[in-house]
Amino acid sequence: MSSKSIELPVLGQVLRLNCPEEQHEALKQAARELDLRVSEMKERTGILQLERVLSIVALNLSYELLQAQQKTTSIEALLQHRIQQLDHSLESILTQKVNN
């Protein structure tokens, strides 16, 4: 995986980053999403201080990430439980076949 430089317009500035080329499109999309969220937050709240708006957007993004992680953990636990149930059912069926 080789890194290549990418320029991303973020909040009226250009950030130059090195990252694997296959991540370029995702980073561009993330930069657009950040710009959009900051613009929406400024418009919705009327807050003009960029640092304050960025803090609120960062908090919202962190909250969304935490919610997604909790949902993933819950789904993983549910799937693990279901796999154990299926495994137990298969063992029971195989045991019955061997005993018959």
UniProtKB/Swiss-Prot annotation:
Membrane-crossing segments per the record: none
Tagged with keyword Zinc: no
Keywords on record: Cell cycle, Cell division, Coiled coil, Cytoplasm, Septation
GO biological process, one term: division septum assembly
InterPro entries hit by this protein: Cell_div_ZapA-like, Cell_div_ZapA-like_sf, Cell_div_ZapA_N
Presence of the UniProt keyword Oxidoreductase in the record: no
Pfam families: ZapA
UniProt-annotated location(s): Cytoplasm
Major localisation: cytoplasm
Entry coiled-coil feature ranges: 21-45
Xref: SUPFAM superfamilies: Cell division protein ZapA-like
GO cellular component terms, A-Z: cell division site; cell septum; cytosol
Function of the protein: Activator of cell division through the inhibition of FtsZ GTPase activity, therefore promoting FtsZ assembly into bundles of protofilaments necessary for the formation of the division Z ring. It is recruited early at mid-cell but it is not essential for cell division.
Family: Belongs to the ZapA family. Type 1 subfamily.
Assembly, per entry: Homodimer. Interacts with FtsZ.
The protein's name: Cell division protein ZapA
Lineage of the species this protein comes from: Bacteria, Pseudomonadati, Pseudomonadota, Gammaproteobacteria, Pasteurellales
